[in-house]
Regions:
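Short beta-strand
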Residues: 25-33
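Short secondary-structure junctions
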Residues: 20-24
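Residue-level signal for threonine
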Residues: 31, 187, 201
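Beta-rich nucleic-acid/ligand-interaction surfaces
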Residues: 32-40
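Charged/polar, low-hydrophobicity segments characteristic of intrinsically disordered regions
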Residues: 163-191
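DNA replication initiation modules
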Residues: 1-14, 18, 40-164, 191-212
Length: 213
């Protein structure tokens, strides 16, 4: 059977995985990176998700640098399996949960990409004074360029705000709803302005969930 391994490199992604991943019967990791591999019976296009180089300052001290997560699927993608000795930290990879490989209930490709985008947007989270515009602009992109409904956008932005320790997270709860009703919708240019990067950089991140500039 074909397997999909969701390889988590940035620990921030684990917080979103706990929220949205649902049931997974096969999880492994190692002491320096526990619960970093989720495995299902499935087939997906393999992809590595990395922050573009002009955002490197946000992950300067991360153990895996710009790499956030990776979808490993197919025989060409090598995964260190439980029982193996990890070459970098000289520690054994071990199962943390193993009850066989289950099929994912729902759209696995969508949820893995959603987790990865949320991870990036949380790592890049705006400083105080710019957070409301940042969240409003994220909502604008998702309203205009995805098929997500208001409830999903509302939850996505609220959870990013919560995990980013935004003390006004409650005020971000209805961003999808309000963005859809707004006469003027902010989008990628506003996010790029806040983060002081190019619009194409932001477009790259949102392309992970199928949104294009």
């Amino acid at each position: 059977d074909s397997l999909v391994d969701f390889d988590i490199d940035n620990p921030k992604a684990k917080e979103f995985a706990k929220l949205w991943l649902g049931k997974c019967n096969a999880i492994f990791g190692r002491d320096h990176n526990p619960s970093s591999h989720y495995v299902w019976k499935n087939v997906l296009p393999p992809q590595k998700f990395e922050l573009p180089s002009d955002l490197t300052k946000y992950v300067e001290y991360a153990a895996h640098g710009n790499c956030l997560c990776e979808i490993r699927s197919s025989q060409s993608k090598y995964t260190i399996v439980p029982g193996s000795l990890h070459s970098k930290d000289h520690e054994y990879v071990r199962w943390e949960k193993y009850e066989g490989f289950n099929e994912y209930v729902g759209d696995l490709n969508k949820v893995l990409r959603k987790i990865t985008l949320a991870t990036a947007l949380s790592l890049l989270y705006a400083i105080k004074g710019q957070r409301d515009e940042y969240c409003t602009a994220i909502a604008g992109v998702l309203v205009k360029q995805t098929d997500w409904d208001d409830a999903e956008i509302n939850d996505f932005i609220y959870q990013i705000a919560e995990i980013s320790n935004d003390d006004e997270a409650e005020n971000r709860k209805l961003k999808g709803t309000t963005a859809r009703k707004a006469k003027r919708i902010f989008g990628m240019p506003k996010i790029a302005q806040i983060l002081e990067c190019e619009v194409k950089t932001i477009a790259h991140l949102f392309s992970w969930v199928g949104a294009e500039d």
